[in-house]
């Protein structure tokens, strides 16, 4: 369950103030609904069928993007190197209405299946089966029927999807729930709509995955250390790759070359992400300073939009690039982002996935 009251994250989500306190009664009601849904699930009132293979859920408790998709890509590639046969499911955010699960390929339409699934297919060269549908359990059924060799499923988001049956590792199972957390943290720690949280910050998880540095507030107050004391957490290093031209992927330049070639005032960075500032900050760390145009997540692009941007060089994300296949503008350069999984994380992940199926030993 989520709210779409705000096109982009309001500032009062970051710190408690008059507006967030005024909206707090609605957040309390939202929390009550969450607890009721959890109770129904825990009591087994709604029957769900266990999945025959382990499930890795890469989700977040804060609305908006926190960097889940690069993690899904990195997980699939690393697990494949280790001998696993991953499959991927996604809701397909930003997609048009669907009546049945759909198989995603690198040439699928983002408007039909969503931005992230197409990006995953492109970055993995269609190596893994990817299925999208809001009802994730049906996606799993379609995936396993189409690709019975799959022995582990990665879900891009889905923490709040109660219909996605799981037996988490922390309870002795072999399914894994990851909460991805970026530099914004939990903001004012209120639930929607007074704050940015889909679920309480204290939500159980098997591990927290950090994709950014702690916010200034957390460094100053020490809340971060107190909250994560005794919890399993991993810091995942992210880095920007070598940009390539949108109309000619073989034409590449380093960010340093681009920064030397164009003056800052003649360059513009554009990002339609849940947290576009992260892209801009990553560029700045590489010495690229330019004008910034932040857009809402899943923003749509047209030739007319880019024509209005007066710049000699336009830098966009790979997620945005999948929606620009029909655009021919030599000024546009795509900046890929990759992610490194530390070995201690991979070893822990392996130890969980290799557990025996707990469903076989229950009466």
From Swiss-Prot:
Domain of life: Bacteria
EC nos: 2.7.1.130
This protein's GO CC annotations: plasma membrane
InterPro entries reported for this sequence: LpxK, P-loop_NTPase
Record pathway: Glycolipid biosynthesis; lipid IV(A) biosynthesis; lipid IV(A) from (3R)-3-hydroxytetradecanoyl-[acyl-carrier-protein] and UDP-N-acetyl-alpha-D-glucosamine: step 6/6
Reaction equation(s) it catalyzes: a lipid A disaccharide + ATP = a lipid IVA + ADP + H(+)
Disulfide bond positions: none
Keywords: ATP-binding, Kinase, Lipid A biosynthesis, Lipid biosynthesis, Lipid metabolism, Nucleotide-binding, Transferase
Record family assignment: Belongs to the LpxK family.
Function: Transfers the gamma-phosphate of ATP to the 4'-position of a tetraacyldisaccharide 1-phosphate intermediate (termed DS-1-P) to form tetraacyldisaccharide 1,4'-bis-phosphate (lipid IVA).
Protein name, entry field: Tetraacyldisaccharide 4'-kinase
């Amino acid at each position: 369950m989520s709210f779409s009251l705000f096109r982009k994250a309001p500032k009062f989500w970051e710190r408690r103030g008059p507006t967030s306190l005024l909206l707090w009664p609605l957040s309390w009601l939202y929390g009550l609904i969450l607890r009721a849904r959890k109770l129904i699930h825990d009591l087994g009132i709604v029957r769900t069928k266990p999945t025959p293979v382990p499930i890795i859920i890469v989700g977040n408790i804060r609305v908006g993007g926190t960097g889940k998709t690069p993690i899904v890509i990195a997980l699939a590639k690393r697990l494949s190197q280790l001998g696993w046969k991953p499959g991927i499911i996604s809701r397909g955010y930003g997609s048009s209405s669907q009546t049945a699960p759909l198989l995603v390929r690198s040439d699928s339409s983002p408007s039909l299946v969503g931005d992230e699934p197409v990006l995953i297919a492109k970055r993995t060269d269609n190596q893994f089966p990817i299925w999208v549908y809001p009802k994730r359990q049906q996606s799993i059924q379609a995936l396993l029927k189409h690709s019975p060799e799959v022995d582990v499923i990665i879900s891009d988001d889905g923490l709040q999807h109660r219909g996605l049956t799981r037996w988490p590792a922390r309870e002795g199972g072999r399914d894994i729930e990851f909460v991805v957390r970026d530099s914004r943290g939990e903001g004012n720690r209120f639930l929607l709509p007074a704050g940015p949280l889909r679920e309480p910050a204290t939500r159980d998880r098997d591990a927290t995955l950090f994709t950014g540095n702690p916010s200034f507030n957390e460094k100053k107050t020490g809340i971060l250390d107190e909250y994560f004391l005794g919890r399993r957490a991993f810091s995942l290093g992210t880095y920007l790759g070598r940009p390539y031209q949108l109309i000619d992927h073989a034409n590449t330049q380093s960010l340093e070359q681009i920064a030397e070639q164009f003056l800052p005032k003649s360059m513009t960075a554009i990002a339609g992400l849940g947290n576009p500032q992260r892209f801009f900050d990553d560029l700045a760390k590489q010495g690229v300073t330019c004008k910034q145009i932040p857009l809402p997540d899943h923003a749509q692009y047209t030739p007319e939009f880019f024509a209005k941007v007066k710049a000699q060089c336009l830098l966009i994300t790979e997620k945005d690039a999948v929606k620009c296949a029909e655009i021919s503008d030599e000024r546009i350069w795509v900046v890929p982002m990759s992610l490194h999984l530390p070995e201690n994380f991979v070893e822990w992940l392996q130890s969980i996935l290799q557990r025996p199926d707990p469903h076989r030993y229950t009466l």
